Swiss-Prot record:
The gene is mvd1. Belongs to the diphosphomevalonate decarboxylase family. This is Diphosphomevalonate decarboxylase mvd1. (R)-5-diphosphomevalonate binds at Y25, W26, G27, K28, R82, S161, G162, S163, A164, C165, R166, T217. Homodimer. Keywords: ATP-binding, Lipid biosynthesis, Lipid metabolism, Lyase, Nucleotide-binding, Steroid biosynthesis, Steroid metabolism, Sterol biosynthesis, Sterol metabolism.
Length: 404
């Protein structure tokens, strides 16, 4: 870290990943603390495909108020209770260090300038808030040189965006709902590192990059208040599935992992449909993707792929690397090789696939047509690591905002 002077700009930069839940988080028992009604579990996706890059900086030369710039646009921090809560908690931890060691520079007293960029559309059902808040918390924690572990920091990230706590770790991550009123036991925990089951792959079918009709927070509140299915899901369905899918991950049992993933996605969207008024996140293209996955599994004679949908129409389809040609190759044959996204670090295995491995007559022809016309791009990815500290700063040594 730079030497202390009146004009010193302190900086730390990190990347953070997107995570896609296989056991869904939906509904809060305490909205102010972002405490969930049920536990959840996700796969952290590779940052070679999707990531948020965030630089946290502080300096006496900055204006008095903290600043946050997201994808080039200034954000109003003062109206975001979630962001304020994260920054307040991180400042308190830094202040404790400074109180214990008076020789440390008083970074907790300096205004922050935080600059963040996603390499994917924000608020389009790609879990941008999870990566965003995880990157913010990790970058500020690094700036402040905090000793807290990712598990401890996950309590803070949770207050920004519930699912952000899971993006502070790589691999397969559980968010334990906890029981305490203060939320101290509601935190993320690594179930298995990416290295335990590195063969996990995913293809994201991007249906629309438009902003969703019903924001997640609003949708959750409606479901909790009006869905009779919801209480049963939270109380009995999810706890059983959490235990079963954690065992499946430890055993690298894809068939069980896949069935639980698909059933839980269906269960989550059933509670949305059971809300009053009903909430529709999936559309005709989403349902065509569901039919395609079941048709591929049926044609192959075993479970080789699994769909899951968050609060949006995009399909995330999990499969193992050894089945890339069967799953992603069939999708490539349906959509055409010129569809945006059939490139990059996870594409090598598909380069020579020119025809569908699964005979297309075994796939619902209506689903094929809907997918052809309804998918704007794909994202090829796989299980990956947690946040990574980098030197690609978005703020210069003199405090100026840079482009990545």
């Amino acid at each position: 870290m730079a030497a202390t002077s009146d004009r010193t700009v302190y900086r730390a930069t990190t990347t953070a990943p997107v995570n896609i839940a296989v056991i869904k988080y939906w509904g809060k028992r305490d909205a102010s603390l972002n405490l969930p009604t049920n536990s959840s579990l996700s796969v952290t996706l590779s940052q070679r495909s999707l990531r948020t890059l965030t630089t946290a900086s502080c300096s006496a030369i900055y204006p008095a108020a903290d600043e946050l710039i997201l994808n080039g646009k200034p954000q109003d921090i003062q109206t975001s209770k979630r962001t304020l809560a994260c920054l307040s908690n991180l400042r308190s931890l830094r202040q404790a260090l400074e109180n214990a060691d008076p020789s440390l520079p008083k970074l907790s007293t300096l205004p922050l300038r935080i600059v963040s960029e996603n390499n994917f559309p924000t608020a389009a059902g790609l879990a941008s808030s999870a990566a965003g808040f995880a990157a913010l918390v990790r970058a500020v924690a690094d700036l402040y040189q905090l000793p807290q572990s990712p598990l401890e920091l996950s309590r803070i990230a949770r207050q920004g965006s519930g699912s952000a706590c899971r993006s502070l770790m790589g691999g397969y991550v559980a968010w334990r709902a906890g029981e305490r009123e203060d939320g101290s036991d509601s935190l993320a925990e690594e179930v298995a590192p990416a290295s335990h089951w590195p063969e996990m792959r995913a293809i994201i079918l991007v249906v629309s990059a438009e902003k969703k009709d019903v924001p997640s927070t609003e949708g959750m509140q409606t479901t909790v208040a009006t869905s009779s299915l919801f209480a049963t899901r939270a109380a009995s369905v999810v706890p059983e599935r959490m235990a079963a899918i954690e065992t499946a991950i430890q055993n690298k049992d894809f068939a069980t992992f896949a069935e639980i993933t698909m059933r839980d996605s269906n269960s989550f969207h059933a509670t949305c449909l059971d809300s009053w008024p009903p909430i529709f996140y999936m559309n005709d293209v989403s349902r065509a993707a569901v039919r395609l996955v079941h048709d591929i599994n049926r044609a192959v004679g075993r479970t080789v792929c699994a769909y899951t949908f968050d609060a949006g129409p995009n399909a995330v389809i999990y499969y193992l690397e050894k089945d890339s040609e069967v799953v992603a190759g069939t999708i490539k044959a349906i959509l055409g090789p010129n569809t945006e996204g059939f490139d990059g670090p996870f594409y090598d295995i598909l380069k020579n696939v020119t025809a569908s491995v699964v005979p297309l007559e075994k796939v619902d022809s209506r689903a094929v047509e809907i997918l052809k016309n309804g998918i704007s791009r794909v994202i090829l990815t796989g299980v990956g690591e947690g946040p990574i500290s980098v030197e690609d700063h978005l703020v210069s040594a003199t405090g100026d905002i840079l482009a990545s």
